[in-house]
Every structure is written in structure tokens, then in C-alpha cells.
């Protein structure tokens, strides 16, 4: 008796007989909804205020764990209050105190945060990292959170003015690399940013001015009413008046935050590269990393804005009166208008790097009347040189602040 055996090719072999099959293409399309909260509150470190406890999931019963990363200077000022707060809410906190200055904004700091997360054994979805500090530390911790197991929840508590109106309200994270500012980074939203003006009471005047640069930016490109309010109140703006959060100061800060969020929300991942919030951020990265002694971020932005005001005046986007008002406000905020290393050559270097970042076009935002902006792609080296001379001539006439 003989048996006949028939062997049939498997379905898998047939379907994926690659040499004989035509080309195969799969297309995947997905969406990831993102939502986060920016909340202005008072007395954040008072145990009677549940905002921070709620942000980390603490309910007054023991067991809630969190990693709290604190700026070294902030820890000296508020470390006891922070620890007392979490003790009152019976949270089990692991503490990491780190420097928060621009010179240490590097990948090594990101690794240090992820190492602390690993040693703590933080859970990927239900235990949070809290960063308490300025813009530099928020960028570092945000980047660490975005990379750790490809994303761990985190909470921001900005303690500087620039952190409260700018760095703390968007989704960018990043560190400096080589001679380039924020060359490495990610987009990663916090669950919540908690803003308490009380932290500003201990911020030095220079750092208040640092944050004012970002507020002036929003006024120039988006909010003429904010610009007029700043003209009226800039002489009164201080760490104490901001911390007291009277009606005018509250409006200044809240308008700046609302304006920033209004610009960011429809373009959170920068799919559109014409961004009005890039105003003051075309030439400033090159200046910020080359100045010696170092400039604060807002100081470099101020010098950049002054040149952009001059460029706009040269193109008659701004009247002479408007240009002078803009420069006068920047100077009145205690910010520089010029800097010795800010040469025509450096302007060209900065613009060339911005063109690479903006995918081959300048996409340079310029004010088109106070409170409005346009984008240009044809600024020349000669224009840059004239703009620099315009600002220098203005400072010579007015004895405005150079550097």
C-alpha cells in the first residue's frame, strides 16, 4: 500500500515570498492627544493649598511617591518649606538637588536625573517627577522625563519670571551641545505647571529683567495693550510688586502667559516654522553662548529684539516713533540694547544657523506695527549692518544701556 503525501505551501510563505511579490507598503497614521494645565495660584507651599499635592497624587495618606528635583539656590531658600509641605501631605519623596545655571545645561544633567529615577524605581505612569526651579532646570528635567522609558509624567513649578511666562508654559525641553544652545531636545508636555508669584520675591532684579524680555516680546508681536501697560508700569515692576500680584502686575503676567499659550497651542510641535514667538530668538542664541561674562537668556533676547526693531524701522514696518518707543521700553526694563560681541559678522552667523533650524528659509519675525508681526525671508548682510548702527546711534543719543 502506498501513500501519497501532498505538501502545501503555508499561507505565511506565500504571502511573504518577497522575491516574487510586488512591493509592499504599510502606512500608519496615528494621533496623540496632548493636554496640560497651566495654573496660577498663591501660597503653593502652604499645606492648606492642595494644588501641588493633587499634582503628584497625594491625598494625605502615606504611600504616594514622587521624585522632586530642586534648583540648588531654590533649595536654600525654600527647601524647608518644600519638605514640610510634602511631609504634611504624607508623600514619600526622593530629593535631588541640582545646579540650574546655563553653564551646566548639558546631557550629563539629563543622565543624572534619569539615574535618580532608576534608583528610585519610579513607576512609569503613576509616579511623578516634580521640577522646582528656573527655565534651565525645567528644560533638563523635562528632557529626562521624556526619555525615561520613553515618557514619564512630570510637574513643573517655575520659580523665576522667565520660567513662569516662557519656559514653564510650553512643551520644549533641551540642553546645550557643543557651542550650540538647545541643540538637543524633545517636545514633551508636563501634566501641569503650577505658577506661584510668591517665588518671585527672592528673585534678583537682573533676573526679573531677564523675564521681562519675554513679556516685552509678546507685547511687541501680539499685544499692543500689553505694550502700553508695560510703558505705564515698567518703572514699578520689581520682585516685590510681582510677588504681591496687584491688579497691574497680575494683568502683565497673565496676558504674557495667555498670549504665549495662544501662539503655541495650534503649533505645539512646530510643524509650521513661521512662529511669531521666535521673535528675539534668531540672533540671540549665538550671542548668548559667546558673551563673556555670560548673558542671561532674556538679555540676549533683548539685544536681538533691538536689532529686529531697527530692521523693522528700516523697512518702514515701524514708524520712527514706534521704534523709539520699543527701544525705550527694553532699556527701561533694565535690559541691554547692544553688546560688544554682537557684531555684523555674528549677526550673519546667527541668521545662517536660524535658516538651518527653519528648514532653509529665514522666516524672520519682525514687528509690523506694535502688537503685530510679519515674516521675511530676504534680510541682507547690509541690512543687518545698518540695523546694528541704528541701535548704536540710538544708545549714543539717549545714553541707553549698552553692555
Label each residue range with its predicted role.
Residues 30, 60-61, 121-124, 147-149, ...:
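Solvent-exposed alpha-helices and their adjacent loops that cap or buttress functional pockets
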Residues 3, 7-17, 22-25, 31, ...:
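C-terminal charged capping/lid subdomain of soluble metabolic enzymes
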Residues 229-345:
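Active-site segments that bind and position negatively charged phosphate/pyrophosphate groups
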Residues 3-127:
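ATP/NTP phosphate-donor binding region
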Residues 114-132, 141-156:
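Non-catalytic interfacial helical region
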Residues 143-236:
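A glycine/threonine-rich phosphate-anchoring loop and its flanking beta-alpha core
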Residues 136-143, 164-165, 286:
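Short glycine/serine/threonine-rich phosphate/pyrophosphate-binding segments
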